[in-house]
């Protein structure tokens, strides 16, 4: 089936992910559950058909863009799959952006319409006059009626009621662009990556089924949000590919809200980013199974998982975390640990169906133990960036995608993250990975999170500087900084210890949880002026 759908032919992803499940008798099964509502496969099919019919009546044609500014509720899959079914390009938008950032994404994408959660509608309505391409605002959720009363705004439910649910799916093809995902902007302005219909099933089969072993009996919960490539696969394409069920959390994940979902829905598979695993481990209520007596596997991506964190989780919760790496450009995870073969501190090995290699700045392939840029190839690679020709040519080179991440491969074939290309720096003439120092820092009992950059000392020599967030209840005394430096020397090496340590309440992160080290470098540069 995978080989077939990757051929250029008539194909719409909604057929495989929704209609096929209804056809095999799963119509009454819950596909999605949020705190207030559930959505069965039959309801998902009927309502996405209605929304797909409504979009052309609003003037949206195939390949027009529809922005989705939605919390993780049942409205997200309805809007996303309705757009896909209609051949309209869905563009999920990070719900944590500022009004200026919303304006940037909406202007850059030239979205003809937006579906927005009522609680997020105010900033969109305030900037609407600056967006000539944005013809329609569609509001969902509690408060939608109040927003619609302002004029020029549609209620999502009103659009659905006005349409029949007679079968309808646009005549798209497998190689046609189905949706865009904006990169998280860990190194600057976000870029829109274009993805095709066939890529969704490719990732579901290779990672979801091939590595995680997801089946129709699984209930999944992803703390990573649906607007994030990682979350889109975790909570939507993976479970829908087999007729599974998904628990959704609209709010930002905290240990309290996550554990509440775990207790209520008892998921079998849990996905998160390393910083959330660290916060959960620091929470007093974390226990065996993390609230779910059915939990069989946990998954991490977004940033590298420190080895000590994975080992503590396994000891406390009784379930391994499969750490891996993916990207918006590749849509999902392409390197991963796997059940029964977990090596903490590594990103695992290539997911079958993907190839990976490490190259130097001239594109020459490097051997084991050598640090270079990770490049990958596989069936889910994006079609390039929207309106970013030069960056597309640098990233998507023939069959290979350049990740911008520094890695090394050990003699056993496991890949180890060393940092972003921009984040690496030399100390005493040797390349230093900020992640290695950060992993040593968070293994200290007082430190919850850490970020490391290179900073010039008084002689103009680059040395490591650390920014740390302390665990609740820890107050540094005069010995703290020397103890931490000694701890890092013992864990990472005597030349890698941070010469300066700043304590912060939090670290700058993207909406998907990645540390923005470039912002810390900018802060230091401003101080030196």
Model-derived features with residue positions:
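Flexible, low-complexity linker/hinge segments
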Residues: 4-11, 127, 145-177
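Conserved pre-ATP/AMP-binding loop-to-beta segment of ANL
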Residues: 28, 138-139, 161-182, 189, ...
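Conserved AMP-binding/adenylate-forming core of the ANL superfamily
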Residues: 28-73, 77-81, 98-103, 155-158
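Conserved AMP-binding A3 loop
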Residues: 40-43, 178-202
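Structural core segment of the AMP-binding/adenylate-forming
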Residues: 57-58, 85-158, 470-472
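AMP-binding/adenylate-forming catalytic core of the ANL superfamily
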Residues: 97, 114-116, 263, 270, ...
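Conserved AMP-binding/adenylation subdomain of ANL enzymes
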Residues: 201-222, 227-268, 283
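Gly/Ser/Thr-rich phosphate-binding loop
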Residues: 267-272, 282-343, 355
């Amino acid at each position: 089936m995978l080989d077939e759908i990757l051929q250029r032919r008539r194909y719409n992803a909604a057929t495989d992910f929704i209609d096929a499940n209804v056809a095999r008798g799963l119509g009454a099964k819950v596909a999605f559950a949020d705190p207030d509502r559930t959505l069965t496969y039959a309801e998902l099919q009927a309502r996405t058909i209605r929304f797909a019919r409504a979009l052309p009546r609003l003037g949206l044609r195939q390949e027009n863009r529809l922005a989705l500014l939605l919390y993780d509720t049942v409205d997200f899959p309805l809007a996303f799959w309705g757009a896909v079914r209609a051949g309209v390009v869905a563009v999920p938008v990070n719900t944590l952006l500022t009004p200026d950032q919303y304006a940037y994404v909406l202007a850059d994408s030239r979205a003809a319409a937006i579906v927005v959660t009522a609680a997020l509608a105010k900033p969109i309505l305030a900037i609407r006059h600056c967006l000539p391409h944005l013809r329609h605002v569609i509001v969902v959720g509690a408060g939608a009626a109040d927003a619609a009363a302002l004029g020029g705004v549609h209620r999502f439910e009103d659009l659905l009621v006005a349409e029949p649910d007679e079968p309808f799916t646009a005549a798209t093809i497998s190689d046609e662009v189905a949706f865009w995902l904006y990169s998280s902007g860990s190194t600057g302005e976000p870029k829109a990556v274009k993805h095709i219909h066939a890529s969704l099933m490719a990732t579901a089969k290779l990672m979801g089924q091939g590595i995680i072993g997801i089946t129709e009996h699984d209930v999944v919960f992803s703390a990573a949000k649906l607007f994030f490539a990682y979350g889109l696969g975790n909570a939507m394409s993976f479970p829908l590919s087999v007729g599974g069920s998904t628990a959704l959390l609209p709010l930002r994940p905290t240990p309290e809200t996550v554990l509440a979902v775990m207790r209520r829905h008892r998921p079998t598979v849990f996905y998160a980013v390393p910083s959330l695993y660290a916060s959960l481990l620091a929470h007093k209520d974390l226990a065996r199974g993390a609230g779910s007596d059915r939990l069989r596997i946990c998954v991490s991506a977004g940033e590298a998982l420190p080895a000590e964190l994975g080992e503590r989780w396994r000891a406390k919760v009784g379930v391994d975390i499969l750490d891996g790496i993916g990207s918006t450009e590749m849509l999902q995870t392409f390197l991963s640990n796997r059940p029964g073969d977990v090596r903490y501190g590594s990103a695992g090995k290539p997911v079958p169906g993907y190839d990976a290699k490490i190259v130097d700045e001239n594109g020459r392939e490097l051997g084991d133990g050598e640090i270079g840029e990770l490049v990958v190839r596989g069936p889910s690679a994006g079609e390039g960036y929207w309106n970013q020709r030069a960056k597309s040519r640098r990233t998507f080179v023939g069959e290979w995608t350049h990740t911008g991440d520094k890695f090394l491969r050990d003699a056993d074939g496991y890949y180890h993250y060393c940092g972003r290309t921009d984040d690496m720096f030399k100390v005493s003439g040797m390349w230093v990975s900020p992640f290695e120092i950060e992993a040593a820092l968070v293994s200290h009992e007082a430190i919850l999170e850490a970020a490391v950059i290179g900073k010039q000392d008084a002689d103009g020599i680059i040395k490591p500087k650390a920014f740390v967030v302390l665990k609740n209840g820890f107050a540094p005394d005069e010995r703290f900084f020397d103890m931490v430096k000694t701890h890092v020397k013992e864990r990472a090496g005597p030349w890698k210890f941070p010469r300066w340590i700043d304590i912060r309440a939090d670290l700058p992160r993207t909406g998907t949880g990645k540390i923005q080290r470039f912002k810390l470098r900018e802060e230091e540069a401003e101080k030196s002026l």
